[in-house]
């Protein structure tokens, strides 16, 4: 059986920009992407902690060290600058792969700096 499991999470990032007139996507600082192993063009699920919106888009690599989290195109209607978001990817794994799977979680501060890295196993709680 194949199951869809969380693979990476950027936890409590702050939206730094919103660009309605761009084609689409979310732009994320390349350092953050590297830390959680998210690739450009990879599909992401996004949760806006401020208004409860949930949506999907794809990733564009942003300037390294910028802290940039920019929602582009139609998705920009679902956020405001300074909103807190959670950005996640998922992987499809078989039962054997699940046993060793440990998602990478980057916990962010208000400046979009990584303050903690967690290699999450089941029943891990991040506040």
Curated annotation (Swiss-Prot):
Entry binding sites for substrate: 57, 73-75
PTM-bearing positions, type Pyruvic acid (Ser): 25
Keyword Cytoplasm: yes
Post-translational modification: Is synthesized initially as an inactive proenzyme, which is activated by self-cleavage at a specific serine bond to produce a beta-subunit with a hydroxyl group at its C-terminus and an alpha-subunit with a pyruvoyl group at its N-terminus.
GO cellular component, one term: cytosol
Active-site residue list: 25, 58
Keywords per UniProt: Autocatalytic cleavage, Cytoplasm, Decarboxylase, Lyase, Pantothenate biosynthesis, Pyruvate, Schiff base, Zymogen
Name the record gives this protein: Aspartate 1-decarboxylase
Biological source species: Staphylococcus carnosus (strain TM300)
Upper taxonomic lineage: Bacteria, Bacillati, Bacillota, Bacilli, Bacillales
Gene: panD
